[in-house]
Swiss-Prot record:
Residues 307-380, 447-499 are annotated as: Disordered. One of its GO terms (molecular function) is DNA binding. Residues 341-353 have a biased composition (Basic and acidic residues). Immediate-early transcription factor that controls the initiation of viral lytic gene expression and lytic reactivation from latency. Triggers lytic replication, and initiates a cellular senescence program in epithelial cells. Up-regulates human DCR3/TNFRSF6B by directly binding to its receptor. Globally induces a proteasome-dependent loss of SUMOylated proteins in the host cell and the loss of promeylocytic leukemia nuclear bodies. Improves the stability of the triplex capsid protein TRX1 by reducing the ubiquitination level of the latter. Its main location: host cell. Residues 355-364 have a biased composition (Basic residues). InterPro entries: Herpes_TAF50. GO terms for biological process: positive regulation of viral transcription; regulation of DNA-templated transcription; release from viral latency. This is Replication and transcription activator. Keywords: Activator, DNA-binding, Early protein, Host nucleus, Host-virus interaction, Transcription, Transcription regulation, Viral latency, Viral reactivation from latency, Virion, Virion tegument. Residues 321-338 have a biased composition (Low complexity). One of its GO terms (cellular component) is viral tegument. Interacts with human ATF7IP protein, leading to promote and regulate host genes in virus-infected cells. Interacts with RNA polymerase III complex; this interaction downregulates small RNA transcription and 5'-pppRNA production.
Length: 605
C-alpha cells in the first residue's frame, strides 16, 4: 500500500531538502509496515528524531518570533501522518516497530504542548498588557478549538482533525507574517509571541523510544514495550475510555466537555505537572503544596468547606434541628417555600438530587443551610478515607463563584448512602437564618475570594483576611415581609488609631519596597541556583525557562543604586512593571505557570 500524500503538502515553510528527507522517511515507514524492511535496517526511530530536530532548527532560523508554533505544528503533522499510515494497515501488519507503538504517546505529548501554548497566548496577553489583533486572535481561537477537539478524539477521524489543525495553524502564521511585513505588529507583541510559543523538548518526546540498556534511541520493540509499561497512566476524564501516559499535564479546563469547566482557565488542576512539561523540574511552589498546607486540606480554596463531620465538631443545637427538618422535607415542601423566584428555579434544577435522598450521588444542600449528618455521633466511616485517597490522585480546585462542593465520588456497594454531612460549611452567626428568610435577591452579594498564586502567604488564609478591609455596616434583622427595613442606628464610634495599630495598616510605599526587595533577592538567589543546577546536570541550559517581564525587571533593578529612594517618584519603566506585578493577580499566576517562580516565594513577608 502506497503512503498517503495528502499530508505532505501541509507542512509550514520547509526547505526542499527537508521535504525530500521527509518523503523518503514516510515511504520507508510504509515499507516497514508492509514488512518489506525491518525498522532497524532503515533506522526509522533515529531518522524520525533527526527530522523533528530539522523542523525545530528550520523554525528557529526562519520562523521569527513564532517559530515555536511553526515547529509544534510541523511535528504534530508529521506524527499524524505516521499514525494515519499505521491505522490504514491491518492489525497483523502494523505495530511491529518502535514508532508505531510510541506514536500515540508522542501524539498526545505534541497535542498537549500545542494546547498549552495556545492557552497561554490568550491567558497571558491581558496580564502582560498586550493587544492581540482581531485577525490573529480569531485565527488563533480556531486553532485552539480544533486542538481541543483533537485532544478528545486523537485516535478517531485523524485525517479531518489533522487537516483542520494544519489549516488553522497555516492561517495564523500567514496573518502574523503579513502583518509583520506591513509593520502592524509592535515589538512588545513580537516579544510576547517569542515568550509564549516555546519549542517542544525532543528528549521528553522520544523518552519512550530510548533503550534502557544502551541509553540511545532504539527500534527494538521489546525494549519499548517494557519501558511503556513502567510509565504512569492517566485519563482525560472519568467518562472517557481513552487513556494516555502524559495527559497528567493537561489543565482542568480540558478534563471535561462541559462548558462550565472552561470558564476559569486560570484555576487549573495539575499545573505543577504543566510546569514540568514547559520547563522541566523546577523549584517553584506547586498547587499540591499549597493545597496540603497546615491550615487544612480544602481550607485554602473556599470559605464554605471547612472540615469533615466528626464527633469533635458538633453543630449548633438550634441550627441542627432546623436544618435536619429542612433537609428531610425539602423533597415535599420545595414548592411552598417563602423564597424568591430565583431560589425556586434553583430548587427545580436540583430536583433530581432532592427527591432521592438515598441515591448514589452526594446530596447538595440549599444555599445557606447546614447539612444534617445522619449519624453525627458515630466514628469516622471508611468512605471518608476513600475520599482522601481519591482527592490525593487529582486535586480539585472549585470555581470561586460556584457552589464549593466536590463532584460525586464513586463508591462500592455496601457503604452508607446517606452522605448529607460530608462537608460542613463554616458556621457564621446569623448567616444561615438571613439566607433562609431574605432569599438570594435580598442578601448581600457573596464575596469572592481573590486568587493568590501558590506559595503566596495569602493563599492559605481565610476569606476575611485575604480580602481588602471594607467598612462593615450594621447587621440587619431578617425581613419577612415587603415593608421597608428600619433605618440602621449608628454604632459606637470607631476607636482611635494607636501608633502600634498604625503599623498594621496597608502602606503602598511599604508594599512597593517589599516587592522590590523580594524581586532583588529572587534575581540574586533563584537564578544563580538554576544555573548551578544546570551545571550539575539537573537542568538543560539549551531550554531555559522563559521569563518575560522578569528579565526586564532584573535589568532595570541592576541599573539602579542599592539605596532606592521610594519617597521620590520612580522611573516610568519601573513604575509600570511594579504596577503590573502588584495590581494584576493574573500575571502572578501566569508567571508561576510559565516559569515556576513567584515573587512571594521568598520568606520576606
Amino acid at each position: 500500500m502506497r503512503p498517503k500524500k495528502d499530508g505532505l503538502e501541509d507542512f509550514l515553510r520547509l526547505t526542499p531538502e527537508i521535504k525530500k528527507q521527509l518523503g523518503s522517511l514516510v515511504s520507508d515507514y510504509c515499507n516497514v509496515l508492509n514488512k518489506e524492511f525491518t525498522a532497524g535496517s532503515v533506522e526509522i526511530t533515529l531518522r524520525s528524531y533527526k527530522i523533528c530536530k530539522a523542523f525545530i532548527n528550520e523554525a528557529k532560523a526562519h520562523g521569527r518570533e513564532w517559530g515555536g508554533l511553526m515547529a509544534t505544528l510541523n511535528i504534530c503533522n508529521f506524527w499524524a501522518i505516521l499514525r494515519n499510515n499505521r491505522v490504514r494497515r491491518r492489525a497483523e501488519n502494523a505495530g511491529n516497530d518502535a514508532c508505531s507503538i510510541a506514536c500515540p504517546i508522542v501524539m498526545r505529548y505534541v497535542l498537549d504542548h500545542l494546547i498549552v501554548v495556545t492557552d497561554r497566548f490568550f491567558i497571558q496577553a491581558p496580564s502582560n498588557r498586550v493587544m492581540i489583533p482581531a485577525t490573529i486572535g480569531t485565527a488563533m481561537y480556531k486553532l485552539l478549538k480544533h486542538s481541543r477537539v483533537r485532544a478528545y478524539t486523537y485516535s478517531k477521524v485523524l485525517g479531518v482533525d489533522r487537516a483542520a489543525i494544519m489549516a488553522s495553524g497555516k492561517q495564523v502564521v500567514e496573518h502574523l507574517n503579513r502583518m509583520e511585513k506591513e509593520g502592524l505588529l509592535s515589538s512588545k507583541f513580537k516579544a510576547f509571541c517569542k515568550w509564549v510559543f516555546t519549542y517542544p523538548v525532543l528528549e521528553e518526546m522520544f523518552q519512550t523510544m530510548v533503550s534502557s540498556k544502551t541509553g540511545h534511541l532504539t527500534d527494538d520493540v521489546k525494549d519499548v514495550r517494557a519501558l511503556i509499561k513502567t510509565l504512569p497512566r492517566a485519563s482525560y476524564s472519568s467518562h472517557a475510555g481513552q487513556r494516555s501516559y502524559v495527559s497528567g499535564v493537561l489543565p482542568a479546563c480540558l478534563l471535561s466537555t462541559k462548558s462550565k469547566a472552561v470558564e476559569t482557565p486560570i484555576l487549573v488542576s495539575g499545573a505543577d505537572r504543566m510546569d514540568e512539561e514547559l520547563m522541566g523540574n523546577d523549584g517553584g511552589a506547586s498547587h499540591t503544596e499549597a493545597r496540603y498546607s497546615e491550615s487544612g486540606q480544602f481550607h485554602a480554596f473556599t470559605d464554605e468547606l471547612e472540615s469533615l463531620p466528626s464527633p469533635t465538631m458538633p453543630l449548633k443545637p438550634g441550627a441542627q434541628s432546623a436544618d435536619c427538618g429542612d433537609s428531610s422535607s425539602s423533597s415535599s415542601d420545595s414548592g411552598n417555600s417563602d423564597t424568591e423566584q430565583s431560589e425556586r428555579e434553583e430548587a427545580r434544577a436540583e430536583a433530581p438530587r432532592l427527591r432521592a435522598p438515598k441515591s448514589r450521588r452526594t446530596s447538595r444542600p440549599n444555599r445557606g443551610q447546614t447539612p444534617c449528618p445522619s449519624n453525627a455521633a458515630e466514628p469516622e466511616q471508611p468512605w471518608i478515607a476513600a475520599v482522601h485517597q481519591e482527592s490525593d490522585e487529582r486535586p480539585i480546585f472549585p470555581h470561586p463563584s460556584k457552589p464549593t462542593f466536590l463532584p460525586p465520588v464513586k463508591r462500592k456497594k455496601g457503604l452508607r448512602d446517606s452522605r448529607e454531612g460530608m462537608f460542613l460549611p463554616k458556621p457564621e452567626a446569623g448567616s444561615a437564618i438571613s439566607d433562609v428568610f431574605e432569599g438570594r435577591e435580598v442578601c448581600q452579594p457573596k464575596r469572592i475570594r481573590p486568587f493568590h498564586p501558590p506559595g503566596s502567604p495569602w493563599a492559605n488564609r481565610p476569606l476575611p483576611a485575604s480580602l481588602a478591609p471594607t467598612p462593615t455596616g450594621p447587621v440587619h434583622e431578617p425581613v419577612g415581609s415587603l415593608t421597608p427595613a428600619p433605618v440602621p442606628q449608628p454604632l459606637d464610634p470607631a476607636p482611635a488609631v494607636t501608633p502600634e495599630a498604625s503599623h498594621l495598616l496597608e502602606d503602598p510605599d511599604e508594599e512597593t519596597s517589599q516587592a522590590v526587595k523580594a524581586l532583588r533577592e529572587m534575581a540574586d538567589t533563584v537564578i544563580p541556583q538554576k544555573e548551578e543546577a544546570a551545571i550539575c546536570g539537573q537542568m538543560d541550559l539549551s531550554h531555559p525557562p522563559p521569563r518575560g517581564h522578569l528579565d526586564e525587571l532584573t535589568t532595570t533593578l541592576e541599573s539602579m543604586t542599592e539605596d532606592l529612594n521610594l519617597d521620590s517618584p520612580l522611573t516610568p519603566e519601573l513604575n509600570e512593571i511594579l504596577d503590573t506585578f502588584l495590581n494584576d493577580e493574573c500575571l502572578l499566576h501566569a508567571m508561576h505557570i510559565s516559569t515556576g517562580l513567584s515573587i512571594f516565594d521568598t520568606s520576606l513577608f
